[in-house]
């Protein structure tokens, strides 16, 4: 019996397949909003999984104890809440996601300083590539809105190294702060995925129940009353 690959390997393969279209996004945007929405939902749900980045970070930095895990998850770095995201219009939601992921992309670039050999933590660079792919799709989805969303075309930004500060925290505190940031990032992406799910459900529901949709579908359940029919006929009879 052949051994099954570990979960992390399966997740890495899934991520590689899902974000394979990243290089194509730079060549042009898809004109299919359902296709883009499907990709965005999948991307958000997968990156919302802590196994894609937080869990490898915890293991790599020796934070895998109940106390240290609690320190990571009890005080996450603040990201836009799910309630706030639900209240935004579609253009504002896309703009918020695009800007927030830009901040995450730069912050993950600063994480490089924690790893003398970046190949020791390949999940970090993979996560940054995935974020760039999501931002590309957000940009493409924004182009399909009417009026289109004004966000800059995605480009390869700088290396993302952080500027030196006057009071540098200790190594252990840097690890805890980074862990909190990653936990907040995963929670944010989970919220983004759930909002995108509602986009699909809400658009179909509102379209089916709209008066215009009923008229286009020839809904004959709503008929004028007999009195209104008689009045209309009398108005058509020449006098």
UniProtKB/Swiss-Prot annotation:
Biological process terms in GO annotation: behavioral response to pain; immune response; meiotic nuclear division; negative regulation of hormone secretion; negative regulation of meiotic nuclear division; oncostatin-M-mediated signaling pathway; peripheral nervous system development; positive regulation of apoptotic signaling pathway
UniProt family annotation: Belongs to the LIF/OSM family.
Function: Growth regulator. Inhibits the proliferation of a number of tumor cell lines. It regulates cytokine production, including IL-6, G-CSF and GM-CSF from endothelial cells. Uses only type II OSM receptor (heterodimers composed of OSMR and IL6ST). Involved in the maturation of fetal hepatocytes, thereby promoting liver development and regeneration.
Organism domain of life: Eukaryota
Propeptide residue interval(s): 209-239
InterPro entries: 4_helix_cytokine-like_core (IPR009079), Leukemia_IF/oncostatin (IPR001581), Leukemia_IF/oncostatin_CS (IPR019827), OSM (IPR039578)
SMART domains documented for this protein: LIF_OSM (SM00080)
Name used for this protein in its record: Oncostatin-M
Cellular component terms per the entry's GO annotation: extracellular space
């Amino acid at each position: 019996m052949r051994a099954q690959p570990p979960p992390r390997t399966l997740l890495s393969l899934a991520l590689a397949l899902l974000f394979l279209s990243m290089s194509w996004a730079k060549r042009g945007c898809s004109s299919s909003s359902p296709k883009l929405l499907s990709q965005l939902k999948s991307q958000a749900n997968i990156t919302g999984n802590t196994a894609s980045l937080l869990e490898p970070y915890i293991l790599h930095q020796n934070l895998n104890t109940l106390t240290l895990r609690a320190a990571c998850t009890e005080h996450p770095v603040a990201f836009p809440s799910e309630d706030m995201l639900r209240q935004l219009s579609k253009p504002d939601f896309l703009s918020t996601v695009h800007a927030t992921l830009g901040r995450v992309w730069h912050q993950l670039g600063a994480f490089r300083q924690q790893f003398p050999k970046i190949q020791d933590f390949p999940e970090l660079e993979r996560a940054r590539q995935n974020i760039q792919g999501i931002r590309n799709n957000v940009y493409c989805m924004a182009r399909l809105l009417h009026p289109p969303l004004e966000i800059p075309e995605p480009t390869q930004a700088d290396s993302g190294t952080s500027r030196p500060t006057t009071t540098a925290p200790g190594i252990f505190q840097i690890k805890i702060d980074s862990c909190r940031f990653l936990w907040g990032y995963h929670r944010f992406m989970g919220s983004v995925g759930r909002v995108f799910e509602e986009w699909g459900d809400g658009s179909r529901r509102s379209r089916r129940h709209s008066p215009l949709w009923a008229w286009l579908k020839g809904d004959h359940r709503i008929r004028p009353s007999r009195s209104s029919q008689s009045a209309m006929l009398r108005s058509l009879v020449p006098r």
